[in-house]
């Protein structure tokens, strides 16, 4: 069974919380499909090239059909010529890939389970830095001692945001923004208990 590490108000180890046993049976392919879809959706479909039907000019036949011994030329807009249209060039393609709700939920479960198995899923009752000082936020992350950390809160208040925003390799999201990709890509996850309960219940 996968276990998340519970931290007390001083961010010290204070026990464990067990994730549902069903999480162990989920296939990693669900996470692969979700990450592939998520990254594809970030692609900007701005690449565009004109075809021979769209470039300007070329209304006149450039040379006689017969007599020169060369190949037949019907238009200067052909992809064969400089200034002509492009054959099979990029169009404004839609890169989005569909992933159904069940696969999204399974991907999230798998990502949480993987972090727990690695000893990198940390649960805290509430994460608030009342002073808004980065020094205190750094002290919190030093207790976790991981290369980079995703912080998931129910609601991020202004002071806590100010404390964490300038720290390298640290990213904060609220519950509605978290997804399987973010959980999987960071080396550790610090999550509020209410959010973890909600995610495991929804998933």
From Swiss-Prot:
From the Swiss-Prot or TrEMBL record, what is one GO molecular function term?
structural constituent of ribosome
List keywords of the entry alphabetically.
Ribonucleoprotein, Ribosomal protein, RNA-binding, rRNA-binding
State the source organism's domain of life: Bacteria
Per the record, its GO cellular-component terms are: ribonucleoprotein complex; ribosome
InterPro entries, A to Z: Ribosomal_uL4 (IPR002136), Ribosomal_uL4-like (IPR013005), Ribosomal_uL4_dom_sf (IPR023574)
Query: What is the organism lineage in this UniProt record?
Result: Bacteria, Pseudomonadati, Campylobacterota, Epsilonproteobacteria, Campylobacterales
Q: Which family does it belong to?
A: Belongs to the universal ribosomal protein uL4 family.
Protein species of origin:
Aliarcobacter butzleri (strain RM4018) (Arcobacter butzleri)
Among its keywords, does the record have Ribonucleoprotein?
Answer: yes
Physiological role? One of the primary rRNA binding proteins, this protein initially binds near the 5'-end of the 23S rRNA. It is important during the early stages of 50S assembly. It makes multiple contacts with different domains of the 23S rRNA in the assembled 50S subunit and ribosome.
Q: Which Pfam families did the record assign?
A: Ribosomal_L4 (PF00573)
Please state what the protein is called. Answer: Large ribosomal subunit protein uL4
